[in-house]
């Protein structure tokens, strides 16, 4: 489970529970269509699972991004 993942916020945080908003902010996602590259760790996988209905997730082609 090594490498990196591209995570994009696909839907707005408006009207979402505070826990979901905190998870998104911790991932560095603050605006719709923002993309961040994160390490593929169990912690990040858990965060993605919590808010998967708001995200678009892609595996990064290489770890340099």
Swiss-Prot record:
Keywords: Ribonucleoprotein, Ribosomal protein. Part of the 50S ribosomal subunit. The gene is rpmD. Belongs to the universal ribosomal protein uL30 family. CDD domains: Ribosomal_L30 (cd01658). GO terms for molecular function: structural constituent of ribosome. This is Large ribosomal subunit protein uL30. One of its GO terms (cellular component) is cytosolic large ribosomal subunit. GO terms for biological process: translation. It comes from the Bacteria. Pfam families: Ribosomal_L30. The keyword Ribosomal protein applies. The lineage of its organism: Bacteria, Pseudomonadati, Thermodesulfobacteriota, Desulfobacteria, Desulfobacterales.
């Amino acid at each position: 489970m090594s490498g990196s993942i591209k995570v994009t916020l696909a839907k707005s945080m408006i009207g979402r529970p505070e826990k979901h908003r905190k998870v998104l902010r911790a991932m560095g996602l603050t605006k719709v269509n923002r993309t961040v590259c994160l390490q593929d760790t169990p912690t990040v996988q858990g965060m993605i699972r919590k808010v998967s209905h708001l995200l678009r997730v892609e595996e990064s082609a290489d770890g340099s991004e």
